[in-house]
C-alpha cells in the first residue's frame, strides 16, 4: 500500500508547533519551574487537524531538537 504524500503545509505546521513548544519550555524555565514538572507540548506531526498533546517532564524536552521531534502517533 503506497504512503500518502505529505501535505505542502506540513513543514510549516511542524515549525510553528516547534516554536510554540520551545516558547512553552522557555517560559517554564524563566518562571523557575522544577525539572520534574510535567508539561503538555503540542504534537509536531505536521497535520493541521492534529490536536494531540504530549506530556513531558521539563528535563525530557530537548530545546535543540529539530521540528517534528515530538510526535504522539
Report residues per predicted region.
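Polybasic/polar functional segments that serve as interface/processing modules
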Residues: 1-73
Amino acid at each position: 500500500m503506497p504512503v500518502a504524500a505529505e501535505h505542502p503545509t506540513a513543514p510549516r505546521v511542524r515549525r510553528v508547533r516547534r516554536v510554540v513548544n520551545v516558547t512553552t519550555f522557555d517560559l517554564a524555565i524563566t518562571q523557575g519551574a522544577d525539572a520534574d514538572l510535567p508539561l503538555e507540548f503540542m504534537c509536531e506531526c505536521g497535520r493541521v487537524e492534529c490536536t494531540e498533546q504530549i506530556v513531558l517532564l521539563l528535563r525530557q524536552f530537548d530545546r535543540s531538537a529539530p521540528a517534528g521531534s515530538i510526535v504522539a502517533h
